[in-house]
Design a protein with these regions (language model features):
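Long, low-complexity serine/threonine/glycine- and acidic-rich segments characteristic of extracellular
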Residues: 52, 76, 82, 86-160, ...
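Bacterial signal peptide processing site
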Residues: 26-29
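Bacterial N-terminal signal peptides that target proteins for export
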Residues: 2-15
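C-terminal motif of bacterial Sec signal peptides marking the signal peptidase cleavage site
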Residues: 22-24
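Short, compositionally biased P/S/T/A/G/V-rich stretches that sit at domain boundaries
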Residues: 40-72, 157-187
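N-terminal leader/capping segments at the start of a protein or of a new domain
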Residues: 38-39, 134
Length: 283
């Protein structure tokens, strides 16, 4: 069987992004994934096959059950995986057999990447009614194994609905990398600290319709261009002022750490708002 690579959800719209898939192997109690619409960069990725071992990367949604009624404003998601060991430390670096992570979508829109068995999905700005949660195995470079996606349907009927977040007028947004400093040497774990101004960062809106003045930020290594709009080099995304990262999968030598503001759909703001610093990765 030939396995093809596609843009990682809306990961493809950013660094991406992920952005996000066509076919799910439905297991017991898990709904087949509805057909997705074409995503940015899909045509350029169609001819790029996944490595043969990617077919063994499997996920299963342990909870919520398919058809579950959700009355809270967050959905606890429990995922099991086989055929790979999730490692967020390797995200955005070269693919290695047996490692990766998983992406979560709500209604075919990427929320975030995860590496732990448990994740929490906010229902902020989500209308009541039926929605679909999808989990997809992903390689280090965020290529999704769409054939092994799993989905469940939920009925969101909140007992205390959240007030909808409305557009905000915040002035001209900016982002500045506070740490690491230019010329720093990275070895093992390191943090990227940023200062975002005139921009409201929130995880609760990830994967939801865009809201002016709101979003989050991504960190890429060396590039924000190329296949899937640079998604292959996205290390992580954040809605705070710090990201805990690792140089574990990076090649030794000089690299550029790039931080940029992204909207709820993971696309960079237009015009792009970014900051970058040159660093060295220890040999």
């Amino acid at each position: 069987m030939e396995w093809t690579l596609s843009p990682a959800g809306r990961f493809a719209a950013t660094a991406l992004l992920p952005p996000l898939l066509l076919l799910a192997c439905g297991g017991a109690g898990q709904a087949s994934r509805p057909a997705a619409t074409p995503k940015p960069g899909q045509s350029e990725q169609a001819a790029m096959p996944l490595p043969p071992w990617a077919s063994s990367m499997k996920v299963a949604i342990q909870s919520p059950a398919d058809g579950a009624k959700i009355t809270a404003n967050q959905v606890p998601l429990q995922v099991s995986f086989s055929g790979f060991q999730p490692s967020c430390d390797l995200a955005g670096t070269a693919n290695v057999q047996g490692t990766g992570h998983y992406h979560v979508e709500i209604d075919k829109s990427l929320v975030d990447m995860f590496c732990a068995p448990s994740a929490t999905i906010s229902m902020q700005n989500v209308k009541s009614g039926t929605h679909t949660l999808t989990v997809l195995p992903a390689l280090n470079d965020h290529a999704e194994v769409e054939q092994n996606a799993k989905s469940v349907s939920i009925d969101y009927e909140p007992t205390q609905p959240l007030a909808e977040i409305a557009p905000a007028s915040v002035g001209t947004p900016s982002i500045k990398i506070v740490s690491p400093k230019a010329g720093s040497t990275l070895n093992g774990a390191f943090d990227v600290w940023v200062q975002a101004s005139n921009f409201n960062v929130t995880c609760d809106l990830e994967g939801k319709p865009d809201v002016a003045g709101y979003g989050h930020w991504h960190v890429n290594l060396d590039s924000t261009s190329g296949p899937m709009m640079g998604m292959m080099t996205m290390l992580r995304m954040s809605c705070g002022n710090v990201l805990h990262l690792s140089a574990k999968g990076m090649t030794p030598g000089r690299h550029t750490v790039i931080a940029f503001l992204a909207d709820n759909q993971h696309a960079p703001l237009n015009p792009m708002i970014e900051d970058k610093v040159a660093v060295n990765v220890a040999r």
